[in-house]
């Protein structure tokens, strides 16, 4: 029912709306990957701090804090591109423009590969300078942070593909696949790596946990890219 005045000639009117529960549910499912990412961060950070306190004391926690601040600058590049390109993918998929979806998919993977290598190389160069800004007052802590950052930065080679995979399936309306990638990547694989790797390599295992988790998640992302192509047809246009 529309509420309109007899003298109102506008095409826009106030109307009594309906509650579309199915649409709301689908939107929640499609955005569940972002929910899982944010929920898992707290749990993973708690375990990181626990392991670092056990293996390296307060210096380990301080080094981790520096790494998180610096790493966010690199991770933001991947997240920004994935989130920014998602509406374009959604638009062309909704318009049944499979050729353009294929084009976006192929070019995005190539771009992410180039950026991943470039950022990893850049991070290796700037690590000493970034660490010195935060912990230059302590030579031992500076050495620990620099080494930790170098090990952690290896994850930049892989991370972008997983971030993009999760966002890409969200853009296609496949929230379940997107959430699965995000859940495994940010919680399950990281928790497993944080529990297993320190037992093998000590504190280096803590710094390598994120790379191991991203590598395992990459296998899942590749599997989903291959199998879901039968439904969405983005690999061959």
Predicted regions: what is each one?
Residues 16-47, 52, 73, 77, ...:
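Hydrophobic faces of transmembrane alpha-helices in multi-pass small-molecule transporters and flippases
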Residues 34-46, 50, 79, 111-124, ...:
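Hydrophobic alpha-helical transmembrane segments in multi-pass membrane proteins
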Residues 63-127, 159-181:
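Small-residue-rich hydrophobic transmembrane alpha-helices
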Residues 46-51, 73, 121, 164-168, ...:
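Alpha-helical transmembrane segments of multipass membrane proteins
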Residues 39-69, 73, 91, 96, ...:
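Helix-terminus/linker motif at the lipid-water interface of multi-pass membrane proteins
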Residues 4-32, 89-155, 196-237:
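Short alpha-helical transmembrane segments in multi-pass integral membrane proteins
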Residues 79-82, 152-171, 177-187, 193, ...:
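Short runs within selected transmembrane alpha-helices of multi-pass transporters and secretion channels
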């Amino acid at each position: 029912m529309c509420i309109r005045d007899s003298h109102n000639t506008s095409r826009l009117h106030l109307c009594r709306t309906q509650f579309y529960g199915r649409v709301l549910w689908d939107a929640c499912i499609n955005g569940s990957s972002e929910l899982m990412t944010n929920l898992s961060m707290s749990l993973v950070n708690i375990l990181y701090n626990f392991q670092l306190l056990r293996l390296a004391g307060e210096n380990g926690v301080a080094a981790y804090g520096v790494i998180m601040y610096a790493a966010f600058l690199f991770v933001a590049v991947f997240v920004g591109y994935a989130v920014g390109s998602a509406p374009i993918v959604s638009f062309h998929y909704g318009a049944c423009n499979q050729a353009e979806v294929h084009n976006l998919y192929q070019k995005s993977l190539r771009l992410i590969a180039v950026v991943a290598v470039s950022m990893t190389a850049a991070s290796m160069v700037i690590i000493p300078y970034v660490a010195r800004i935060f912990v230059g007052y302590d030579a031992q802590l500076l050495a620990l942070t620099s080494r930790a950052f170098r090990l952690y930065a290896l994850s930049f080679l892989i991370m972008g593909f997983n971030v993009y995979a999760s966002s890409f399936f969200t853009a296609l309306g496949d929230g379940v696949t997107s959430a699965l990638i995000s859940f495994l990547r940010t919680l399950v694989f990281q928790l497993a790596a944080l529990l297993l790797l320190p037992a093998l390599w000590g504190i280096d295992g803590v710094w390598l946990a994120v790379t191991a988790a991203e590598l395992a998640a990459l296998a899942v992302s590749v599997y989903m890219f291959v199998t879901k192509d039968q439904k969405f047809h983005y690999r061959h246009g």
